[in-house]
């Protein structure tokens, strides 16, 4: 049979270039075997040790390495029989020259081609056609590798992946041998079909060759015989389903089956390769039997195959179960755990998942125990704090990490989170109460409950505030804490701020009261009505206004009552100067006592307003002095006109500085200036006072925007009226300069300080 195959190989590889490619690929297969020798022990050391005893795995690996070099030649011959195509036949003849002289004739034709291929490697790199064949082969290799690497990502395939990855090296090289030959067969589709047809009898024919090689190897090592014996069954099984596949795929899959013969020596799991090709688990059982029991002789292989299905049966449920249930969630979960929580614990969990199925079993047991723990935790959590966990999956994510390292951190976070939940209740209380509540809330719950409740807070807070899915839960808790603190600070600021607007409200009230007192001093009957209004206002403001304001308002009432006495004395007769002087003396100390009281309050609010009020006080005192001097020298009508004109000038100055006082005083000016020309002054003044009071009440309650609008309208009217009266006021002032100067000079240094 070998002669027929050699003839077929000669017929296919008549072109020297193609034969050279086959030789190169065959040589590369040997190099890949060397790579497998180096790589296999490391992979097997990681994957096989947890399943098998460390000593057994080491012994098997040593035997595999020793046997592999010996099996390289036999495997190449077996591959040529299994693939039954030119590239493998060339490799077979190349080594057949060394081992068997039967194919010397074919070898003579091929050896010079092999030499040429070795020499022409640099030339082939430059040639495009040859690269096209290689690109096809390498492209298929790349396609095969990523699929298995993806399987390697899952922990179950991680154990099998090393075998597949290494097997790919050799089978890929074999595929490279077979695929260029397929390209040559592509010239005529019939030889490809014949290859498929022959591959089946070739697999049957391999049995004597493999058995012969096995008998030779039994002398050297028993493990090799085991490989050779089960291998033909795998080849037969592989050959049966393959005819349905395409001819090109037949070569690749058969090369993979032969590769399983190579790999089983190194790794106990070449099975997935055959399984990935779509073959049943029976092949895997035979391969696993030969690999798992490398020490047993060939005769025991059949019963061993019966025993090994139990091992394989133990493994596949892990593959199905872990891939189906446990492994896919932990991988995304593990990545999230690395981000949101401690990376060390998560990396350990990931390592336990990936290296081997035995570790996966441990992980599954841990996950089960952990899953039972979060259930108990959830019960304790709901009992302790009444929170409802929206996603129990988040607890599973947190559990593996929540072992020892996170517990202290959780205790710290709990101290923060629990008071935050309690803050809305404590907002009415002082900050000291909050600290007490913090200290009290921690000892109430036991340490175990605190740890559990911490996880609850993190999960619950994240779920309530961020409606995102459970995976990002570990990320959000720290920002949720920060936001909670910010909210608590905002609440505290809100508690503080309502006091500030009260102070602001109080200060304009004080200014309004001062303005009311000034107007009351100027007008005769404003004092009594204004006092009644202020009493009503004070009663309304007792809650919000501090006591100092009440004192200032009371002193203002005294001021307002005294000017009423002044006006009452001056109105009937201009004679009582002696009465006015002590009254004025009383006014000044009253003003001294009254105005300094609001001064400490004013600087807290607005210094400008304080300065304006002081200037107003000085001017009011000037007005009172001028009124007294005018009463002594002129009639009451002229006194009122002078006072009104003085007010016009003063109010014009005040309008620039203070808008609220100007509104009140300008309303007084308009009414007073209009009625100053009338003969019946006091009768009109009674009406004026009532109008003034009504005007005062309105602007006090009006908003700033309305006040500004009224100021603009009133100031325009005042300017026209005041300009006409300024001249008369100047004349009256010149006549009364002496008395007015004396009184104002005495009062200014006292009051304006």
From Swiss-Prot:
**GO annotation, biological process:** behavioral response to ethanol; cellular response to ethanol; circadian rhythm; germ cell development; positive regulation of Notch signaling pathway; positive regulation of protein localization to membrane; regulation of actin cytoskeleton organization
Q: Where is the lipid attached (N-myristoyl glycine)?
A: 2
Region (F-actin binding), start-end ranges = 119-148
| Modifications after synthesis and translation | Myristoylated; myristoylation promotes accumulation at the cell periphery.
Where would you find this protein in the cell? Cytoplasm, Cytosol; Cell membrane; Cytoplasm, Cytoskeleton
**What's the effect of swapping residue 523 to A?**
Partial loss of binding to PKA-R2
Full protein name: A-kinase anchor protein 200
Look up and give the organism this protein is from.
Drosophila melanogaster (Fruit fly)
User: Which gene codes for it?
Assistant: Akap200
């Amino acid at each position: 049979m070998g002669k027929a195959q050699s003839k077929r190989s000669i017929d296919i590889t008549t072109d020297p270039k193609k034969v050279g490619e086959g030789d190169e690929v065959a040589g590369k297969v040997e190099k890949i075997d060397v790579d497998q020798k180096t790589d296999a022990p490391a992979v097997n050391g990681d994957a096989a040790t947890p399943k098998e005893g460390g000593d057994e795995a080491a012994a098997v690996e040593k035997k595999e390495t020793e046997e592999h070099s010996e099996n390289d030649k036999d495997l190449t011959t077996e591959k040529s029989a299994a693939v039954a195509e030119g590239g493998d036949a060339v490799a077979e003849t190349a080594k057949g020259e060394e081992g068997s002289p039967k194919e010397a004739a074919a070898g003579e034709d091929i050896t010079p081609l092999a030499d040429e291929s070795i020499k022409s490697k640099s030339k082939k790199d430059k040639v495009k056609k040859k690269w096209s064949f290689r690109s096809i082969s390498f492209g298929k290799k790349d396609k095969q590798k990523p699929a298995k690497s993806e399987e390697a990502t899952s922990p179950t395939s991680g154990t099998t992946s090393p075998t597949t990855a290494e097997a790919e090296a050799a089978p890929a090289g074999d595929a490279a041998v077979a695929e260029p030959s397929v390209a040559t067969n592509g010239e005529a589709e019939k030889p490809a079909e014949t290859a498929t047809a022959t591959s089946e009898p070739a697999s049957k024919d391999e049995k004597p060759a493999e058995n012969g090689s096995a008998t030779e190897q039994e002398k050297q090592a028993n493990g090799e015989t085991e490989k050779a014996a089960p291998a033909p069954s795998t080849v037969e099984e592989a050959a049966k389903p393959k005819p349905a596949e395409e001819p090109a795929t037949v070569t690749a899959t058969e090369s993979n089956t032969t590769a399983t013969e190579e790999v089983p020596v190194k790794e106990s799991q070449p099975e997935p390769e055959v399984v990935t090709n779509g073959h049943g688990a029976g092949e895997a059982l035979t391969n696993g039997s030969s690999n798992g029991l490398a020490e047993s002789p060939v005769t025991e292989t059949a019963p061993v195959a019966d025993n090994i299905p139990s091992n394989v049966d133990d493994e596949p449920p892990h593959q199905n179960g872990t891939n189906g249930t446990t492994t896919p969630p932990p991988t995304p979960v593990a990545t999230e755990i690395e981000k949101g929580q401690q990376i060390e614990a998560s990396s350990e969990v990931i390592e336990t998942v990936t290296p081997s199925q035995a570790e996966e079993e441990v992980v599954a047991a841990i996950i089960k125990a952990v899953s039972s723990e979060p259930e108990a935790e959830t019960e304790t959590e709901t009992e302790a704090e009444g929170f409802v966990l929206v996603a129990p999956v988040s607890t599973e994510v947190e559990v593996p990490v929540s072992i020892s390292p996170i517990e202290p951190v959780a205790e710290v976070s709990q101290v923060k989170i629990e008071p935050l939940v309690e803050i809305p209740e404590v907002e009415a209380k002082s900050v000291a109460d909050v600290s007490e509540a913090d200290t009290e809330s921690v000892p109430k719950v036991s340490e175990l409950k605190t740890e559990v409740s911490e996880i609850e807070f993190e999960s619950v807070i994240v779920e309530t505030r961020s409606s995102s899915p459970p995976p990002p839960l570990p990320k959000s808790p720290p920002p949720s804490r920060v936001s909670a603190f910010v909210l608590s600070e905002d609440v505290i600021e809100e508690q503080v701020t309502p006091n500030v607007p009260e102070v602001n409200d109080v200060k304009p009230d004080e200014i309004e009261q001062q303005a009311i007192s000034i107007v009351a001093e100027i007008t005769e009957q404003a004092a009594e009505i204004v006092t009644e209004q202020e009493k009503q206002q004070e009663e309304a403001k007792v809650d919000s206004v501090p006591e100092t304001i009440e004192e200032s308002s009371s002193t203002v009432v005294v001021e307002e009552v005294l000017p009423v006495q002044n006006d009452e004395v001056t109105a009937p007769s201009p004679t009582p100067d002696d009465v006015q002087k002590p009254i004025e003396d009383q006014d000044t100390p009253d003003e001294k006592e009254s105005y300094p009281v609001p001064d400490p309050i004013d600087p807290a609010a607005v210094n400008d307003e304080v300065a304006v009020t002081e200037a107003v006080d000085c001017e009011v005192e000037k007005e009172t002095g001028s009124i007294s001097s005018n009463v002594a020298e002129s009639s009451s009508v002229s006194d009122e006109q002078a006072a009104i004109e003085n007010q016009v000038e003063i109010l014009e100055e005040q309008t620039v500085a203070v808008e609220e006082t100007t509104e009140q005083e300008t309303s007084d000016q308009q009414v007073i200036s209009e009625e100053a020309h009338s003969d019946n002054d006091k009768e009109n003044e009674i009406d004026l006072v009532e109008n003034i009071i009504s005007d005062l009440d309105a602007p006090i309650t009006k908003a700033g925007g309305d006040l500004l609008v009224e100021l603009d309208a009133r100031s325009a009217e005042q300017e026209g009226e005041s300009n006409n009266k300024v001249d008369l006021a100047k004349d009256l002032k010149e006549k009364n300069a002496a008395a007015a100067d004396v009184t104002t000079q005495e009062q200014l240094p006292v009051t304006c300080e």
